[in-house]
Amino acid sequence: MIDKALLEIQDNIRYNPDRWNEIKHKADGLNSHFQEVIDNKRRSKDRMIHFAAFVSNDAMYGMDAVFSLMMARKDRWDCKVVIIPDVSRGYPHQRDTYIRCREYFAAHYGDDYVVDGWDMEADEYIDVMDDYDIIYFANPYDSMAVKVHSIQYAVTRNVLPVYVNYGYDVGYKTMYARMKGPELNYVWKYFTETIYSYEEIRKLQIINGANVSLTGYTKMDDYSRVNGKTKSRKKILIASHHTVKMDELPLSCFMMYHELILSLPKMFPDIDFVFRPHPLLFIRMINDNVWTKNMVDDYLSKIKKAGIEYSNGGEYFSLFSECDAIINDCGSFTLEWLFTGKPGCFVLNDKLSDEHITTQMKEGIKRYSIAHTNDDIVAFIRDIDADNYSKKQEMDEWVRNNIAINYPNAANVILEEMDILQ
């Protein structure tokens, strides 16, 4: 099955100065349009800012802390989550992720805060753009959405589109592709996370960072308010990335260590293990013909039988708080885990080179123990089992100064920047 988002990435990577000039010309023209939208709002008698988060996957959502602040300021903000379908990976994935996403946000915020962007029974996509003043797009790829849920459609309406990363930018080629596509050059405001990402956006983006604000990584604000469960046993988080077959960003080593995972509970009976794969890992393995659905189901059955906790979607900061260490080959998890101050093992794909990853990812990996083989992973776990690691559990000065910008108040910074009625 063709992955439309991956095709968009590959298309954007191609050298195409004529297309880039067209995007720049349109982006430059949007400045006056956005100012007109703001002026119209200020001239209106409506003193509420109507805000929507367009979300297709609950695990790819970077606005929770901001949304929570809005919920507490009902005198200024009327906020909703609009569930939109991911149409890029086939109907079963579209249906299942939509249902799961809707259920998650209804439970998380309450059903009154959730709006449907898809009538599943009638199979009709619902245009709600004109109901809002500002729309946050959790997904930076229009190829994953239908037209009425896209950024390129939003800029033709009386609305201000904004973007916040749902994860740290770690893949250089994927970041480059987003910088050369229309979506993030067209948004009114693009809130970014670190000085590294800010500088790379200014260097790579077609409009050279004209719409970018360095605000910090709002997603991690929530971590400061999480209290883990009291426990008597050590717990290790295993996080596997989805890039099993992706030359643009060869992070995943899942095919190297997937059998090892199943054997860990017997090897280390005094440690609990949690398996938290990227939400796209198994769907991509199926679509790329790496595994069949039956093979995926069989593996997950073995995970359960081995006594490994399977974490599938939703928030994960409680896991960060509860776990004593992480084994991962992921992207943003690599940087997010640094907020905990706890030990980590990064499983390094031998195909990964500096040209594949962003500066902040390169710097983040340096803070990890590196595993090249299954034996290296086992050695790391032995150290955790034997208490051969620091117990400080707090971020160091480098993380605070370079990665955790405005932590734990990045959400307040973003909220202030979006308040067009000030």
Question: Which role fits each region the language model picked out?
Answer:
Residues 1-3, 374-422:
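C-terminal amphipathic helix plus adjacent low-complexity
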Residues 1-56, 72, 422:
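Non-catalytic N-terminal targeting/anchoring module and adjacent flexible stem/linker
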Residues 19-39, 165, 174, 178-256:
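A nucleotide-sugar donor-handling region in carbohydrate enzymes
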Residues 52-222:
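Active-site and donor-binding regions of nucleotide-sugar-utilizing enzymes
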Residues 62-63, 72, 218-297, 403-412:
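Conserved catalytic-core segment of nucleotide-activated headgroup transferases in glycan assembly
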Residues 82-86, 93-105, 265-312:
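Catalytic donor nucleotide-activated moiety binding site of glycosyltransferases and closely related
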Residues 162, 312-356:
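A donor-sugar binding/catalytic signature common to diverse glycosyltransferases
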Residues 294, 342-387:
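Nucleotide-sugar donor-binding patch of glycosyltransferase catalytic domains
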